[in-house]
Amino acid sequence: IYSDETVGCADDAVDILKKELSTYDREVFGIINLDTKGKVLNFNIVSVGTLNSSAAHPRETFKTAILSNSASFIAIHNHPSGFPNPSPEDLLTTQRLYEAGELIGIEMLDHIIVAENKIFSFAENNLLGKTFKEAKLMLGMNDNTIDYRKNNFRNNGTTYTVIARNNN
């Protein structure tokens, strides 16, 4: 179904899966497996979670990538809340998947969060390959800044900049 599609950027991946991801009322985590030319081999839903979380363990994530003989993959999940900003859990998941991909030789090209008509791309924000601590610092997070799942801004003097863009 996706075999004629080539993915060169976050917008391409979102265009392919926008309809699929918009049908869920809870978080869904999946991967797009790609061949050496960037053509889509398949899309696999790794997990269907709750309203504000979805587990993505490397074991389940890489199962179809390995079976499909993928050269690379793009992780993608939705935020039904409408806020595309990554949570601390999203940062940790990305770091783990990136490191696992390096170990087994399947390159992680991006992790994209889709929320209504906005997206957040880890690649476009230069967060792939960063440690959890580095990514948190780059996003201006600290332990007291924001609980993204509750959208509860704490009054600690830290300003919050939305690192999202409209996906028209």
Predicted ranges, named:
Residues R154-N168:
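Non-Sec secretion/translocation targeting segments of pathogen effectors
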Residues I1-L41:
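Long amphipathic N-terminal alpha/beta scaffold segment
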Residues D4, A71, D143, T159-Y160:
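Low-complexity, intrinsically disordered short peptide segments enriched in small/polar/basic residues
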Residues L137-R154:
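Primarily interfacial, aromatic-capped hydrophobic alpha-helices that serve as membrane anchors
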Residues I31, H111, Y160-V162:
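Generic short beta-strand
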Residues D12-D15, K37, S47-M138:
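Active-site-proximal loop/helix of nucleotide/amide-processing enzymes and allied scaffolds
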